[in-house]
Swiss-Prot record:
Pathway: Metabolic intermediate biosynthesis; chorismate biosynthesis; chorismate from D-erythrose 4-phosphate and phosphoenolpyruvate: step 4/7. The active site is at 71 (proton acceptor). It comes from Bordetella pertussis (strain Tohama I / ATCC BAA-589 / NCTC 13251). The gene is aroE. The keyword Metal-binding does not apply. This is Shikimate dehydrogenase (NADP(+)).
Amino acid sequence: MTLPASPPRYAVIGNPIAHSRSPQIHAMFSAQTGRPLRYERLLAPVDGFLPTVQAFRESGGLGLNVTVPFKLEAYALAEARLSERARLAGAVNTLSWRDGAWHGCNTDGVGLVNDLLRLGVALAGARVLLVGAGGAARGVLQPLAAAGCARIHIVNRTAARAAELAAAWRAAAPRTGTQVSAGALAQAAEPGGWDVAINATASGLQGAAPDLPGGLYAPDALAYDMMYGARPTAFMRQAEADGAARCADGLGMLVGQAAESFHIWHGVRPDPGPVLLALRTELLAAG
């Protein structure tokens, strides 16, 4: 008698990790596409990323989503086998075991761009304000440029960090038609306003918004916060008061980056729409 094969094993690794919605998202993608899988949460000690990954691989693991605080360690693990997106992001959030080695990719920016397109944003020729200069901001520069944005202006509480990120991008990135500039938060205003403003800071964790000046938005502009919740974030409320025509949170980005990871692992692109609707309904019910 032949025993049925175990479904392929995947996981999300981080610390903390109990809050992660990734198992729920990938279970819905699995049901939608008919691709059986086992997907779990892996809590790694802050100094134990590599041993945890090794044990996961020895148990048959084939892919990992990587979250805080391990994206840089995942980058180092796969440094010889990085996608262009991961190389330019300087961080890895998706590991795939292929040909006897871990390969690294970064799907955060693709998740953001796909969600902006879902929301009807015309990114070709768009002027984008990117608030924040950390890993979240760096991870979305390449996909935004690839989508044809005319200008990306990075602003940060510490202006020097924004300038460093812009300079690093210009040095490492292929030539595109996208102008990347930088400044302080107080230098966020643009004549005519921005078409899209993206909050890539963690200010929402404290219920706060970045200290931005007023008059930021073009007539049909969208304000987008990478954070998400049952209620509009502080950044979204700030943007609405400043005249942004529309506001959105980052739940669609979360689902979108997971969909890209699923595609990398399984060769099938799931539909994020039903999953996003289910998560939004759940959030609203809990809130």
